[in-house]
A protein has these predicted regions:
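N-terminal pre-catalytic "stem/leader" segment of glycosyltransferase-like enzymes
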Residues: 1-42, 53, 130-131, 266-271
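Leloir-type glycosyltransferase catalytic cores
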Residues: 78-119, 225-271
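Extended catalytic core of nucleotide-activated donor transferases of GT-like folds
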Residues: 14, 27-79
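Generic beta-sheet signal
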Residues: 46, 68-70, 159, 200, ...
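Conserved catalytic-core segment of nucleotide-activated headgroup transferases in glycan assembly
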Residues: 117-170
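Donor nucleotide-activated moiety binding/catalytic core segment of transferases
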Residues: 30-37, 51, 149, 154-215
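Structural motif
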Residues: 4-10, 41-42, 44-50, 70-71, 121, 125-128, 195-196, ...
Length: 271
């Protein structure tokens, strides 16, 4: 049986309903109900809040195939055509698979600039509070700054998110928003003066690489295949071919129609 987890949030429940529509014999349940089932063969969830992360970890632990949905790598997500990334058995698509360029050419919004090698500032983009909880990386920023300072004399700028809710847990252990982080947001990135972006799993890596700014990321990042994951190598960035990875990423996000007509699931299952 395929179980699809409710998000209990009006803005995101439509993605769940589209998944149910596109997956024959699937059923929508509350997260706490899914993890009690005995006949689950596949699970689907959107995001990690309001109990959905419990389904993710439960499926992972029990070796049940799961499909994780979230905001896309690029494209309109809150209006038609409603792009959403969908990843089988992972949080994001952090690997490369050979794909044609058709979906990329149809939807990619940015020009791809040549690699830029004359920047000055290192811009550090920490994981959100939700991602710190989900991946257990509360000390990521401290560890990252320590490594960078030991290996470079370049200026290091830490970019704070404009929206970064404080995360707690409900009585079932699901992540919930418990407050607001009042840290003021940082100014926009000065791309002309940027030497490199250092981040955990943020999608800023995609924009940066299209602008020709090299990235240093954790393995839990969609641009990890074209980024350096060893932060001690901050003075030797990777300048590698980008387009094939973007083609691959384009086959990891889908429209509402593609969720509903089954195309997304057939691609993810290799059919």
């Amino acid at each position: 049986m395929i179980y699809v987890s409710s998000t209990n949030r009006q803005l995101t429940e439509k993605y769940v309903d589209w998944a149910v529509h596109g997956l024959p014999n699937s059923k929508k349940l509350q997260p706490q109900e899914i993890i009690k089932t005995k006949d689950c063969t596949k699970a689907v969830m959107f995001g990690v809040l309001r109990g959905t992360h419990l389904v993710y970890r439960w499926a992972e632990k029990n070796k049940i195939d799961f499909y994780y949905m979230d905001r896309p790598y690029w494209g309109e997500t809150r209006n038609a055509p409603y792009y959403v990334k969908v990843v089988k058995n992972n949080h994001l698509k952090n690997w490369y698979e050979e794909r044609p360029s058709d979906r990329f050419e149809k939807s990619f919004p940015w020009p791809i600039k040549p690699w830029k090698k004359d920047g000055r500032n290192i811009v550090v983009c920490p994981p959100s509070n939700a991602m710190q909880e989900f991946f257990g990386v509360h000390d990521w920023l401290d560890n990252t700054l320590r490594t960078l300072k030991a290996n470079t004399d370049r200026p290091i700028l830490v970019k704070n998110k404009g929206y970064n809710p404080i995360i707690g847990k409900d009585i079932n252990g699901g992540y919930i928003v418990t407050g607001k982080d009042n840290t003021p947001p940082s100014p926009p990135i000065d791309w002309d003066d940027a030497y490199a972006i250092v981040t955990y799993n943020s999608n800023i890596s995609l924009e940066a690489t299209t602008r020709g700014i090299p990235c240093f990321t954790d393995i839990h990042n969609a641009c990890a295949p074209i980024s350096e994951t060893d932060f001690s190598k901050i003075e030797t960035p990777k300048y590698t071919e980008r387009e094939p990875l973007y083609y691959s990423m384009a086959y990891g996000q889908f429209t509402a129609d593609e969720l509903k007509n089954g195309y997304a699931w057939s691609i993810l299952d290799g059919r």
